[in-house]
């Protein structure tokens, strides 16, 4: 599971022996991968030139390359990348953790190995166990088979905070559509702010509630104001607290590019009015109840609870 500032390798099983086998397989894959021995794996999984016939066009192929080409065909993925790039130009969040297909072919095998050997070390990792198991036995096995084989290594993987900008930045980017699609009302408008620190749990809870009260609930003030102005056919908010400096966004999909200034003005004026008159108490209570229910229910669908609890823990380790 690739995140902007970490990669998670989770394993889970209700069968004890299967769980032990999976631990061994994944730990071996992370710390002793064959890709560091065979460049052919890098070419297959990363990128390579491919010529199927002497008269055919030389093409670029590769598992990750094709995956990211597919991802970049999604306007939502492009928007997400552009939000990070515009807000965090001076740290790692400006780079797409999955790889930008435009730049993937510039990655050499040597550069890949340098990166792997620099960061992929037990000293630069967190390993956690969750569930009904013999924890002491698992820790002893982990130390004997893997951790004791390494000396401690100081790895500088600290992420520097992005300083605040002196003024608002306006950024334009493009995404692809089919030849038959009209460009009319295909613009995504996004208003984004960096808010606080991921270690501030109270702030995280507050913005989770504010997201509901301001833009997600029926008749939410920001959402309703944009809808009444005819800006976009889908308005939503998002609060990303999974990185060092959380981001709050308002987004209008399928809008007109000429509405950008009005979009910004409506959001700021509506927020000022909310500050002056207060948030609707019913919406606020509904947001609090929704947030509390999520925590009490702890229903993560197809994902094991231990995995999601761990991911939440990693959010607190973003520094």
Model-derived segments and their meaning:
Residues 1-167, 179-207, 212-319:
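Charge-rich, well-structured scaffold segments of protease-associated domains
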Residues 169-171:
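Long, compositionally biased
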């Amino acid at each position: 599971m690739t995140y902007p500032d970490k990669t998670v390798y989770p394993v889970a099983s209700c069968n004890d022996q299967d769980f032990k086998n999976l631990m061994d397989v994944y730990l071996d894959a992370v710390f002793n991968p064959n890709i560091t021995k065979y460049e052919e794996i890098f070419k297959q999984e990363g990128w390579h030139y491919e010529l199927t016939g002497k008269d055919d066009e030389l093409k670029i192929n590769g598992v990750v390359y094709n995956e990211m080409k597919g991802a970049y065909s999604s306007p939502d993925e492009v928007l997400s990348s552009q939000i990070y790039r515009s807000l965090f130009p001076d740290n790692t969040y400006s780079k797409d953790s999955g790889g930008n297909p435009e730049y993937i072919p510039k990655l050499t095998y040597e550069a890949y190995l340098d990166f792997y050997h620099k960061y992929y070390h037990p000293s630069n990792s967190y390993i956690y166990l969750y569930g009904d198991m013999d924890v002491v036995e698992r820790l002893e096995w982990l130390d004997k088979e893997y951790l004791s084989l390494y000396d401690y290594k100081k790895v500088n993987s600290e992420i520097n905070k992005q300083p605040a900008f002196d003024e608002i930045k306006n950024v334009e980017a493009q995404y692809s559509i089919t030849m038959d699609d009209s460009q009319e009302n295909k613009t995504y408008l996004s208003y984004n702010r960096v808010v606080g620190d991921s270690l501030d749990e109270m702030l995280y809870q507050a913005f989770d509630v504010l997201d509901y009260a301001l833009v997600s609930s029926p008749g939410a003030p920001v959402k309703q104001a944009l809808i009444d102005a005819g800006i976009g056919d889908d308005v939503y908010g998002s609060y990303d607290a999974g990185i060092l400096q959380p981001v709050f966004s308002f987004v209008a999909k399928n809008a007109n590019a000429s509405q950008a200034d009005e979009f910004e003005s409506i959001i700021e004026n509506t927020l000022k009015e909310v500050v002056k008159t207060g948030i609707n108490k019913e919406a606020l209570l509904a947001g609090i109840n929704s947030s509390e229910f999520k925590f009490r229910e702890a229903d993560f669908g197809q994902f094991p609870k231990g995995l999601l609890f761990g991911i939440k823990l990693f959010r607190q380790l973003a520094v």
